[in-house]
Amino acid sequence: MGVHLEVLDTGEQLMVPGDVLEEENKGTLWKFLLSGAMAGAVSRTGTAPLDRARVYMQVYSSKSNFRHLLSGLRSLVQEGGIRSLWRGNGINVLKIAPEYAIKFSVFEQSRNFFYGVHTSPSFQERVVAGSLAVAISQTLINPMEVLKTRLTLRFTGQYKGLLDCARQILERDGTRALYRGYLPNMLGIIPYACTDLAVYELLRCLWQKSGRDMKDPSGLVSLSSVTLSTTCGQMASYPLTLVRTRMQAQDTVEGSNPTMLGVFKRILNQQGWPGLYRGMTPTLLKVLPAGGISYLVYEAMKKTLGVQVLSR
């Protein structure tokens, strides 16, 4: 757990496995990346109903049937059947490959730069490296995030598919619509990365004080630590995540374009501070199963592909 980049996919953040970063493992890089991508795909598919409920609660929280998780899920099933709970999952899985590859490449370059300055990167340097990796990957896949949000929220018959959704957005709002929510997305990276890594470092210190070997913790300890730190990071950046989703979901109406501050004010005026945490329940509920599924699938894929992890 020396480098906080475990294989954990919560649906919001896909992290690069730390064992990929060891020099001796570079020859089997494609196997690690394939294992991670498969883990993310299975994880997101398994928790897709909770993710769709989260998006609906964030966007339509003023409607009585989407104020609570169970009533929201019931409404979704009534509108489109059981299969509708997986709307938007296709592109959510599709964007794993570019997200994973970009995040890994940027983090690898940042890591090499900092290792050239120090033997071991400091806390601040790891925050910078991780934040830079997330920022660049999110910049490049933001259009896919917008499409994912629109497809997740679509009602039966609204779009014929991914390409039809993209065409309608471009015809109605232009290319700028594909970067709706970009600013709150970027701003949310800092509190997420700082909180995530700070909690992880705290847990690492507590583990070391217990007198146990920090270099070889059990899978359960590693999974629990990353899950808890990731959850805290999500809570710290959640209001910005909610605003991002609201902005991505909104169409341009009569030439108006929703701004980040405008969405913040609207939420606070209509729902108060609690409104900034709408949809938090399904978000928290999916963290543990998503992390557990991705971890187990990743380990199973490595075993299937015959990967032997070699560390320095």
UniProtKB/Swiss-Prot annotation:
Locate the transmembrane regions by residue number: 33-50, 88-107, 131-144, 182-200, 219-243, 279-298
Q: How does it sit in the membrane?
A: Multi-pass membrane protein
**Tissue spec:** Mainly expressed in testis and at lesser levels in brain.
Which function does this protein serve?
Calcium-independent ATP-Mg/Pi exchanger that catalyzes the electroneutral exchange of Mg-ATP or free ADP against an hydrogenphosphate and participates in the net transport of adenine nucleotides across the mitochondria inner membrane.
Which reaction is catalysed here?
Mg(2+)(out) + phosphate(in) + ATP(out) = Mg(2+)(in) + phosphate(out) + ATP(in); ADP(out) + phosphate(in) + H(+)(out) = ADP(in) + phosphate(out) + H(+)(in)
Q: Which windows of the sequence hold Solcar repeats?
A: 27-113, 121-206, 217-304
Q: Which GO terms describe its molecular function?
A: ADP transmembrane transporter activity; ATP transmembrane transporter activity
Which gene specifies this protein's sequence? Slc25a41
Q: Which GO terms describe its biological process?
A: ADP transport; ATP transport; mitochondrial ADP transmembrane transport; mitochondrial ATP transmembrane transport
Q: In terms of domain of life, where is this protein from?
A: Eukaryota
Q: Has keyword Transmembrane helix?
A: yes
Listed Gene3D superfamilies? Mitochondrial carrier domain (1.50.40.10)
Q: One GO cellular component term, please give it.
A: mitochondrion
Establish whether keyword Ligase is in the entry.
no
Q: Which PANTHER family match?
A: SOLUTE CARRIER FAMILY 25 (PTHR24089)
The protein's name in its UniProt record: Calcium-independent mitochondrial carrier protein SCaMC-3L
InterPro entries, per the entry: Mit_carrier, Mitochondrial_sb/sol_carrier, Mt_carrier_dom_sf
Alphabetized, the UniProt keywords read: Membrane, Mitochondrion, Mitochondrion inner membrane, Repeat, Transmembrane, Transmembrane helix, Transport
Which compartment or compartments is the protein found in?
Answer: Mitochondrion inner membrane
